[in-house]
């Protein structure tokens, strides 16, 4: 089953009839318009390309304008692709709404996490700090040793060090679908999702549901 592209509106909470508070993230899922259908014969795989939202005319490049015009859809804020499963069929120009998730219980949400800039190992990797006193004067938050000896004589790939934190693609799996509001194009999922308010999200039926 394909997914949909939405926009993170923010977080709130809703109450059950028993008075239990559920923290939810509100995702606005405007109609996803199909701009291209890829098939085995021409592309080597089956998929659909979709767009959503709107883009100012002066921000649309000529190649983009031609692509959207050929599909007969309004220019959107980006292009995303979803692989098609056996038996799934879509046509160019078709509109897909949030009702796609009407019978879905859990979803996986992918977004770009908030960037935190250059961060040290304590913040980035939860390293323990070294002694505050006991003769330690300069190495309270340094990572410590990063290798061994003349053998192997190098720092291994993947060593946890200071560096850019956040601003990367993150997927949160198996979030409960609390409500699907087709009238207002809203999807409410339990818990937090990656990214800042207003950022794009890819919502798919959960792999591990």
From Swiss-Prot:
Biological role stated in the UniProt entry: One of two assembly initiator proteins, it binds directly near the 3'-end of the 23S rRNA, where it nucleates assembly of the 50S subunit.
Modification after translation, per record: Methylated by PrmB.
Keywords, comma-separated and alphabetical: Methylation, Ribonucleoprotein, Ribosomal protein, RNA-binding, rRNA-binding
Protein name listed in UniProt: Large ribosomal subunit protein uL3
N5-methylglutamine carried by residues: 150
GO cellular component: cytoplasm; cytosol; cytosolic large ribosomal subunit
PTM annotation (N6-succinyllysine): residues: 38
Subunit details: Part of the 50S ribosomal subunit. Forms a cluster with proteins L14 and L19. In pull-down experiments interacts with CedA.
Highest taxon above the source species: Bacteria
GO biological process: cytoplasmic translation; ribosomal large subunit assembly
Pfam annotation, one family: Ribosomal_L3
UniProt entry tagged with the keyword Lipid biosynthesis: no
Taxonomic source organism: Escherichia coli (strain K12)
